[in-house]
């Protein structure tokens, strides 16, 4: 299982999802949980792309077998429903692996938590970097869009 906002898709997302799927082995199935707009606003910032569109795009990505919107409020409800063998965390996700593992154990969810390393092959390797670059650009020919 992989989770995330997936607001403006970039190569780091592809790397994360590919590595998450590889964790499960040859015939693994990757289920992706896309964060709800309310969750993104509470934890990060207002999303650029709404949750339904983000989900639609994630479903189209090659490593993804299934994708769903997360539950409002208790993020563990989705995990309890899916019962993954592995939860792959992205490098920028603010979960502490040990605390997450403790909470999973408390809820009788037997799965491994693995942090995927950072993707640094692209200067625009995060949604925030993309947003900052767009804000800095002067679009003299915006009418052509």
UniProtKB/Swiss-Prot annotation:
Keywords attached to this Swiss-Prot or TrEMBL record, sorted alphabetically, are: ATP-binding, FAD, Flavoprotein, FMN, Nucleotide-binding, Nucleotidyltransferase, Transferase
Q: Which cofactor does it need?
A: a divalent metal cation
One GO MF annotation is: FMN adenylyltransferase activity
Q: In which pathway does it act?
A: Cofactor biosynthesis; FAD biosynthesis; FAD from FMN: step 1/1
Positions binding ATP in this chain are 5-6, 10-13, 92, 119
Q: Which InterPro entries match?
A: Archaeal_FAD_synthase (IPR050385), Cyt_trans-like (IPR004821), FAD_synth_RibL (IPR024902), Rossmann-like_a/b/a_fold (IPR014729)
Is Nucleotidyltransferase there in the keyword field? yes
Which GO terms of type biological process are on file?
FAD biosynthetic process; FMN metabolic process
- Provide the catalytic activity annotation: FMN + ATP + H(+) = FAD + diphosphate
Q: Which cysteines are joined by disulfide bonds?
A: none
Which Enzyme Commission numbers does its entry carry? 2.7.7.2
Per the entry, what this protein does is: Catalyzes the transfer of the AMP portion of ATP to flavin mononucleotide (FMN) to produce flavin adenine dinucleotide (FAD) coenzyme.
Q: Which family does it belong to?
A: Belongs to the archaeal FAD synthase family.
**Subunit structure, briefly?**
Homodimer.
Name of the protein in its database record: FAD synthase
**What organism does the UniProt record list as the source?**
Methanothermus fervidus (strain ATCC 43054 / DSM 2088 / JCM 10308 / V24 S)
Ranked from the top, the taxonomy reads: Archaea, Methanobacteriati, Methanobacteriota, Methanomada group, Methanobacteria
Q: Which gene encodes it?
A: ribL
